Amino acid sequence: SSVNARPCSSPLVCPAKGEKFFGVGSASRIRQLPPRLAWCSIDWDQLCLLHLLGSGGFGSVYKATYHGATVAVKQVKKCSKNHLASRQSFWAELNVACLDHNNVVHIVAASTCTPTSQDSLGTIIMEYAGNCTLHHVIYGIGYLTGNNDGLKRDHEFLSTAQAVVYSCDIVAGLMFLHSQLIVHLDLKPANIF
């Protein structure tokens, strides 16, 4: 099995001020993704949030479907107390969007434009890495498994052989990120799938 780490990266790459986002809106109010992320946009009609997977200081992550595929959707909330930090968190996560490695979660799409019903700084659609985190496995805590009938609890425990596999996969992912001059700033068992 392969371990994926949720992306949280540095150094920060932020677009220049005064540029238009996907050719719409006024230049002073809408930010544009960097040129290397120009493919990023979300077809909102194809996105269906299923249920909350978790939330943290800068946003919430949902299990969802996008164009029929199961994905994880991170909505970065507008943080009134620390707006700069929430913006930096959003842009830092997008730094890994162009990277391709088995142990790094892939970004499917992203946008700073959100439907008016959402109070969000931005949305990132990522590959769905599963229901069970390393935290669940280490501590034998039940994890949520989705099925058509709803949610149920299940658990498994970490063996020595599994610990070695997880460790090797984590090191491989980190070595790749470091080779790209990216540092994971939130590495913990709850962010390892």
UniProtKB/Swiss-Prot annotation:
Its EC number is 2.7.11.1. The active site is at 186 (proton acceptor). Residues 47-193 form the Protein kinase domain. ATP binds at residues 53-61, 74. GO terms for molecular function: ATP binding; protein serine kinase activity; protein serine/threonine kinase activity. Pfam families: Pkinase. Keywords: ATP-binding, Kinase, Nucleotide-binding, Serine/threonine-protein kinase, Transferase. Disulfide bonds: none annotated. It catalyses: L-seryl-[protein] + ATP = O-phospho-L-seryl-[protein] + ADP + H(+); L-threonyl-[protein] + ATP = O-phospho-L-threonyl-[protein] + ADP + H(+). Belongs to the protein kinase superfamily. Ser/Thr protein kinase family. This is Serine/threonine-protein kinase mos.
